[in-house]
Amino acid sequence: MRVAAGTRHDGRVRLEPVTWEILTEQLAEHVAGQASASGDGSAWRRVAVDGAPPAPTGELAEELAEALRLRGRPVLVVDADGFLRADSLRFEFGKQDPDAYYDLWYDTGALWREVFGPLDRGGDGRVLPDLRAPSVDRPTRSPHVLLPRGGVMVLHGPFLLGHWFPFDLSVHLGLSAKALERQTPVGERWRLPAFARYAEEVAPEEAADVCVRADKPRHPAWNGPPRHGSPPPP
């Protein structure tokens, strides 16, 4: 990850203050401009908004989607929680096992098959927006959604990096360990070791194209907008 000039430093990247509105607009400009720069307006764009549950990943994904629609881009927002595995698989080692939460809860194979596969070269653009409803532990039976060519898929949720998903842009909403603990409900703090492991094994603040620090929700900071022309992840 490149380092941008800024006024805050977290030990890895230098950050500068930004508003959510400016951040969203600059991300939308970048995504919309990727197709123009590549000369392939028919290719789908795939965006990650990665972060722990206390981070506003869903809110940013929806705001980014709206900004892209205003630029004439069809958008499909996908919540990773719609691809949680069945309870029998998630809770095989108990309901509060942080390693199982990290390794087993999210069905990455289904995400490859139902979300990324249809948006690959030669795909038909028919994306399954969700697979299961975790609140009732049943399949959602949602119909496939046709995302027109030139459209953008925005996937949001935790642990999105490190799987070689073919994102054209990855945004990580980071929280310091203290902020993450403070903003996590007491009954969910058993998950904290999973996020410590993610930080250690994947280093999302370095792996992502854009890093946003969201310790103070009203006062985010980031490492600056992505540069046009940078190669997509492998």
Name these PLM-found stretches.
Residues A48-E66:
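Glycine-rich phosphate-binding P-loop
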Residues G11-R12, L76-D137:
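Conserved nucleotide-sensing/catalytic segment adjacent to the nucleotide-binding pocket
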Residues M1-Q34, L169, L173, K178, ...:
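NTP-dependent small-molecule kinase module
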